[in-house]
UniProtKB/Swiss-Prot annotation:
Homology family: Belongs to the NusA family.
Compositionally biased spans, kind Basic residues: 476-490
Gene name of the record: nusA
Domain of life from the UniProt record: Bacteria
A Gene Ontology term for the protein's cellular component: cytosol
Functional note: Participates in both transcription termination and antitermination.
Region Disordered: start-end pairs: 463-531
Species per Swiss-Prot/TrEMBL record: Mycoplasma genitalium (strain ATCC 33530 / DSM 19775 / NCTC 10195 / G37)
Domain S1 motif intervals: 165-235
Protein name: Transcription termination/antitermination protein NusA
Length: 531
């Protein structure tokens, strides 16, 4: 524990106490020690009295452990800057030969010090601090830090214990880095105390700015926290649920119920929902007009893709809903010791990559969301070669109508370059696809994954399809939570996926190979980032 004075000199608690002990005249507290007491009170949000009590307790316990002083009393007057340490002895009879010289003193010996003492009184013998050892100071500091931590924890628990799991808005005060300068986390100002959010509690790739306010979930209060007891999170699913509820009146009033959320923070989320009113489409209500609501929420999480899925109590139907927009041809529920927990799903060959997602994120989310122990995905050809006898799907997934309408929408003359939506019908206008595709076009000189978008859509074709007036009408405007911070606009891949021809020689080889599950001619990717 250190404090820096105006002179620039940094003084520790131990150093100041040594200075104090060597300059004792009337057991006066020196200025560095007084300053440290004030600083501890300020930074830990404790009163001066609480810090002084911790120092008193630390000194008493250190003396008892170090010098076997069983009965020691410390009195500190902070206002006058005076500290007194005394050893206490019970006055006993001179005839008592078995007295404990650490706790007791014969009457005759006591009267030599104070003639007014009688049997049963307590003799207070001052202990000079000028000869205090560094070992005793180290013990005192360790106990003092422990007592401060315990006192601070009690204060924090009293204020925040009922708020664990709640969402708060708070300002980033400082950044915490390792010796190499790498990010460890951030210190968050909670007004009456501080909170801490580690790097692992952030969305993937997320960086916070000092001085800005963000939304956090109070995850837990740790008694033995090395920094601050309140642990905060932005990767917790409760923050996503809070934003969905705040931005969707139908969730807030109970018409729509969020059944389950699975997240890969900063990458992708899947939310299972159900409507208690047949007239209310839960997916459309959450997405909002032209997807504005969900786009704003996505920006809060560094562009995280958010999929809304129709929940169904039938485990199989729920799985088929979660796999959308990919088409499920058939399935085979494995009959083994884990009956009804594993399933094999058959989809079109060119949609396998889409089902798996980048680095398998999508299939993991699907499995966790729907409760299947494992979900294995095959093309018809692979299923046949593996002698998998599957049952052809005899029902349509919920939410299929809007997807079927847009799945084969062509925006170029090349029949192999197709864009299809994953949203519900009447949520996003057909014109949006043209506008977003144009926004993704980049200069030929830039070597970025977005080059693929230029191969898909020719500028001249876009200009023919959309007039300047129409473009102005369909510009999506993201509705962001009033207190949220967005580092960049929502990615277009929140709205659609693209199918590219893997045989196109202009594509880099690793752009296809890294996403290819089977050597098919055509592969479907979750987003432009996946290419």
């Amino acid at each position: 524990m250190k404090i820096t004075f105006i002179s620039g000199q940094e003084v520790s608690l131990g150093t100041s106490f040594l200075l104090f002990s060597k300059k004792i005249v009337m057991n006066e507290l020196n200025q560095p020690l007084l300053a440290i007491i004030k600083n501890v009170a300020k930074t830990k949000n404790l009163s001066i009295e609480e810090v002084v009590f911790c120092l008193k307790t630390a000194l008493e316990q250190a003396y008892k452990k170090h010098l076997n002083f069983v009965n020691v009393e410390v009195n500190i007057n902070f206002d006058k800057g005076i500290i007194n340490v005394e050893q206490l002895f019970n006055v006993v009879s001179d005839e008592n030969e078995d007295y404990d010289d650490f706790l007791e003193i014969p009457l005759q010996a006591a009267n030599k010090i104070n003639s007014s003492l009688q049997l049963g009184d307590v003799l207070r013998k001052p202990i000079p601090l000028k000869n205090i050892s560094s070992d005793l100071i180290n013990k005192m500091i360790a106990i003092f830090n422990q007592k401060i931590s315990e006192t601070n924890f009690k204060a924090v628990m009293s204020e925040f214990s009922s708020e664990v799991g709640e969402v708060i808005e708070a300002k980033v005060e400082d950044i915490d880095t390792n010796k190499e300068g790498g990010l460890k986390g951030y210190i968050i100002n909670l007004e009456t105390t501080k909170g801490y959010i580690s790097k692992r509690e952030l969305s993937k790739g997320e960086r916070l700015e000092i001085g800005k306010k963000y939304l956090f979930v109070i995850k837990e209060i740790q008694r033995q926290a090395s920094l601050w007891p309140i642990t905060l999170s932005r990767s917790d699913t409760r923050l996503l649920q809070f934003l969905l509820t705040s931005n969707t009146p139908e969730i807030e009033n109970g018409t729509i119920v969020i059944k389950k959320i699975e997240r890969s923070p900063g990458v992708k989320s899947k939310i299972a929902v159900i409507s208690n009113d047949p007239a209310v489409d839960p997916v459309a209500a959450i997405l909002g007009p032209k997807g504005e609501k969900i786009r704003g929420i996505s920006e809060e999480f560094n562009g995280e893709i958010i999929d809304i899925v129709f929940w169904n109590e039938d485990k199989l139907k729920f799985l088929i809903n979660a796999i959308l927009p990919a088409e499920v041809i058939g399935y085979n529920i494995l009959q083994d010791d884990e009956r009804d927990t594993s399933i094999e799903v058959v989809v079109p060959a060119n949609q396998i990559a889409n089902v798996f997602g980048f680095k398998g994120v999508n299939i993991r989310l699907i499995s966790n969301l729907t409760g299947w122990n494992s979900v294995d995905v095959y093309s018809e050809k692979d299923a046949s070669e593996a002698n998998i006898k599957f049952t052809r799907l005899s029902f349509e997934p919920e939410g299929l109508f809007g997807i079927k309408k847009r799945r084969e929408k062509i925006i170029s003359n090349d029949a192999t370059d197709k864009v299809f939506y994953t949203s519900k019908d009447n949520v996003i206008d057909d014109e949006i696809i043209v506008d977003l595709a144009k926004d993704l076009m980049v200069d030929n000189k830039q070597k970025q994954p977005e080059q693929v978008a230029k191969q898909v859509v020719e500028k001249s074709q876009l200009e023919k399809q959309v007039t300047p007036k129409e473009k102005e009408k369909v510009q999506p405007k993201a509705k962001v939570h009033s207190n949220s911070h967005s580092k960049k606009p929502a990615k277009p891949n929140q709205i659609f996926s693209i199918t590219v021809d893997a045989s196109d020689k202009n594509l880099k080889k690793d752009q296809v190979d890294n996403n290819q599950t089977n050597p098919q001619t055509k592969q479907t990717f979750d987003s432009f980032d996946d290419l």
